[in-house]
C-alpha cells in the first residue's frame, strides 16, 4: 500500500465522462478543496472528457480516458483493470450507475477500499425502480465497501430499494464555495443584453444543461403563462437561461410561437456563472429529478430565493416560504403562480435570499463537505492497519 511507503494515498475517481454537470462539478470541487498534503487524485473517464477538466486546479491530477464505445463495450473493463494495476490507487471511488460496474475491475485489480457515490437519477429511471437497474445495483452491492448518497432521499432509496445495509452508508451533502459567490457590490449588468439591464426588471434565471431531466421546457411554459395571464408584467420580467443542450430548439420554438422571444436570453454555456448569478433576482430549478443540486446551492450562496420542483433532494435544500418555494414537477401553472407571488411581494426576494445564504453558510459549505469526505477516506484506510 502507498501508505506503507510514506506516500500520500491515491484516490481514483471513476466517472462516465468529465464534462459540464453537477456531479462532475462536485468531483472537481472536492479535488480542488482537499489539502495538498492529504491525498493524491486521479480521474478516470469511462468515455472521454471536455475542457471542463481545466477546472481542476492541481497540477498533479492525472485524467485518463478509456474511450468506451457506445453500447456494450466489455473490453473497457479490461482496459480499466490494466490501468488500475498500473496506478495502484488506495481507494476506488465510482459515481452513479454508469460507473458502478468499474467496481468489479477494482476488485480484480486488488483495490481493497471501494466507494460508490449516488448523485441522482436519469430521465429513464427518475424514481429508481427500473427492474434492470435495481438488479444491477443489487448484484454489485457486495463489492462496495462504502456508499455515499448526496441526499437523505437517496439514502432512503438505497436502504429500501437496493437493500444496502444502513451501516454501509454515509450521507454527504454537496458543498458550495461560498466565497466564490459575492453578495456585495454592484451587479455586473454589462454581462446582460441591453434590454435586460433595467433595475426595474425582475430577472428570473436558471443554470444547467438543457436536458429532459432538467425540464427547462416547463420553465419556459411557466414564463409564457405568466406573461399571457398578466400582460402588464411584460415590462417587468425577463428570463435568463444559462446552459446548452438538446432542449434548446424546442424552447426557442415555444418562445417564438408565444411571441415572447424578446423577453428570453439564451445565454449558452458560460464560464462566468457566479457573475451571471449576481445579475438575477430569482433562481428556478424545474427538474423532474435531482440529487443535491449544485446550482441551487450556488443560487442560495448568491442570496437568491429559489423556486424548485418538489423532487429528490430539493426539499432538503429549499425551505418552503423561508428560502423560496417548492412546486410540483411539470406544473407550469404552479410555477407561474410562484413567479407572480414574488413579483407582487418583492420584499420577499431579499428576505428569502438572505435566509438561503445563511442556510448555505451553516449547512452546505464546501469546507464541511470536504471534511466529511476526508473522514470517509480516512476511516477506510485505517481499517487496513
Predicted region positions:
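A short helix/loop element that forms part of the nucleotide-sugar donor recognition site in Leloir-type
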Residues: 181-198, 203
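Donor nucleotide-sugar binding/catalytic pocket of nucleotide-sugar-dependent glycosyltransferases
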Residues: 64, 142-186
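A conserved mid-protein helix/loop that constitutes part of the nucleotide-sugar donor-binding site
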Residues: 21-29, 202, 206-228, 246-252, ...
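Conserved acidic donor-binding segment of nucleotide-sugar-dependent glycosyltransferases
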Residues: 320-321, 325-332, 341-346
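Short hydrophobic beta-strand element within catalytic cores of glycosyltransferases
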Residues: 45, 305-308, 318
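A short, well-ordered alpha-helix in the C-terminal region of glycosyltransferases
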Residues: 334, 341, 348-363, 372-379
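Aromatic "clamp/platform" in nucleotide-sugar-dependent glycosyltransferases that forms part
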Residues: 269, 288
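Nucleotide-activated donor-binding/catalytic signature segment of Leloir-type glycosyltransferases, i.e.
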Residues: 252-268
Amino acid at each position: 500500500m502507498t501508505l506503507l511507503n510514506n506516500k500520500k494515498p491515491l484516490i481514483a475517481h471513476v466517472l462516465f465522462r468529465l464534462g459540464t454537470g453537477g456531479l462532475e462539478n462536485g468531483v472537481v470541487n472536492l479535488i480542488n478543496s482537499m489539502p495538498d498534503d492529504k491525498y493524491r487524485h486521479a480521474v478516470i473517464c469511462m468515455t472521454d472528457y471536455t475542457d471542463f477538466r481545466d477546472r481542476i486546479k492541481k497540477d498533479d491530477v492525472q485524467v485518463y480516458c478509456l474511450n468506451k464505445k457506445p453500447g456494450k463495450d466489455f473490453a473497457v473493463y479490461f482496459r480499466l483493470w490494466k490501468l488500475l494495476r498500473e496506478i495502484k490507487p488506495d481507494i476506488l471511488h465510482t459515481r452513479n450507475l454508469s460507473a458502478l460496474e468499474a467496481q468489479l475491475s477494482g476488485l480484480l485489480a486488488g483495490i481493497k477500499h471501494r466507494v460508490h457515490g449516488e448523485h441522482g437519477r436519469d430521465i429513464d429511471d427518475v424514481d429508481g425502480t427500473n427492474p434492470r437497474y435495481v438488479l444491477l445495483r443489487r448484484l454489485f452491492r457486495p463489492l462496495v465497501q462504502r456508499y455515499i448518497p448526496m441526499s437523505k432521499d437517496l439514502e432512503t432509496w438505497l436502504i429500501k430499494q437496493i437493500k444496502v445495509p444502513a451501516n454501509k452508508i454515509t450521507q454527504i451533502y454537496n458543498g458550495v464555495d461560498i466565497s466564490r459567490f459575492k453578495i456585495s457590490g454592484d451587479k455586473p449588468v454589462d454581462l446582460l443584453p441591453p434590454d435586460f439591464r433595467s433595475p426595474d426588471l425582475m430577472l428570473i434565471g436558471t443554470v444547467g444543461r438543457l436536458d429532459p431531466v432538467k425540464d427547462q421546457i416547463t420553465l419556459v411554459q411557466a414564463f409564457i403563462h405568466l406573461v399571457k395571464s398578466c400582460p402588464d408584467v411584460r415590462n417587468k420580467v425577463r428570463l435568463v437561461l444559462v446552459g446548452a443542450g438538446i432542449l434548446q430548439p424546442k424552447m426557442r420554438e415555444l418562445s417564438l410561437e408565444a411571441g415572447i422571444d424578446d423577453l428570453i436570453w439564451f445565454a449558452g454555456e458560460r464560464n462566468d456563472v457566479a457573475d451571471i448569478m449576481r445579475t438575477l433576482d430569482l433562481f428556478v430549478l424545474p427538474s423532474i429529478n435531482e440529487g443535491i443540486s449544485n446550482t441551487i446551492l450556488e443560487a442560495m450562496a448568491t442570496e437568491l430565493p429559489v423556486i424548485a420542483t418538489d423532487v429528490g433532494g430539493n426539499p432538503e435544500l429549499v425551505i418552503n416560504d423561508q428560502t423560496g418555494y417548492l412546486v410540483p414537477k411539470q406544473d407550469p401553472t404552479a410555477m407561474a403562480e410562484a413567479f407572480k407571488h414574488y413579483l407582487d411581494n418583492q420584499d420577499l426576494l431579499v428576505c428569502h435570499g438572505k435566509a438561503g445564504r445563511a442556510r448555505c453558510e451553516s449547512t452546505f459549505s464546501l469546507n464541511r463537505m470536504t471534511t466529511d469526505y476526508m473522514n470517509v477516506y480516512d476511516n477506510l484506510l485505517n481499517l487496513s492497519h
